[in-house]
Structure formats: structure tokens, C-alpha cells
Swiss-Prot record:
The lineage of its organism: Viruses, Viruses incertae sedis, Fuselloviridae, Alphafusellovirus. It comes from Sulfolobus spindle-shape virus 1 (SSV1). GO terms for molecular function: DNA binding. This is Protein F-93. The keyword Transcription regulation applies. InterPro entries: F-93_WHD (IPR054020), WH-like_DNA-bd_sf (IPR036388), WH_DNA-bd_sf (IPR036390). It comes from the Viruses. Probable transcription factor that recognizes a (pseudo-)palindromic DNA target sequence.
Length: 93
């Protein structure tokens, strides 16, 4: 499966996390995959990159790994979210 060619998977994951902070990792994957199909490997690689680059933090809570944006991630996600929402509207037409 391919992600949309317009955005890198990291951008999509970051934008979706903006509206779903504290979500379990696999639950975020399901949300992202519903609109932007990607393999689990692609999703987890994107998540790993975002953590390494300091955009996302992962915490173990209630027996699950949960994801949170850092301040850097929040600032970047705001602009990505707008662009991705616009792209989704264009695709619907």
C-alpha cells in the first residue's frame, strides 16, 4: 500500500497526532490508515523518525505506548494539518 504521493508519511502521522494526543500507537495507526493507507512498517518507521527528530514523545501508560507532540511537533503540525485538510477536500471533488 502507498501513502498519498503528496505528503510524506511523517507529515500525515504528525498532523493526525495533533488532534489525537495521548492516543495509543496502534489506535493512531488505524486512524491514519483509514484515510491515508500505509503499511504498518511505514507507519512505525515514520513514528520512529518523528521521535528521533524530537517532534513526538512516546510514554508507557496503562500498559500501552501513547504518543504526544513536543512543542516543536505542535508548531510544525499546525501548518501540516491545514495543508492535509485542504488536500482531503480537493480529493473529495
Amino acid at each position: 500500500m502507498k501513502s498519498t504521493p503528496f505528503f510524506y508519511p511523517e507529515a500525515i502521522v504528525l498532523a493526525y497526532l495533533y488532534d489525537n494526543e495521548g492516543i495509543a500507537t496502534y489506535d493512531l495507526y488505524k486512524k491514519v490508515n483509514a484515510e491515508f493507507p500505509m503499511s504498518t512498517a511505514t507507519f512505525y518507521d515514520a513514528k520512529k523518525f518523528l521521535i528521533q527528530e524530537g517532534f513526538v514523545k512516546e510514554r508507557q501508560e496503562r500498559g500501552e505506548k501513547r504518543l504526544y507532540l513536543t512543542e516543536k511537533g505542535k508548531l510544525f503540525a499546525i501548518s501540516l494539518k491545514t495543508a492535509i485538510e485542504t488536500y482531503k477536500q480537493i480529493k473529495k471533488r
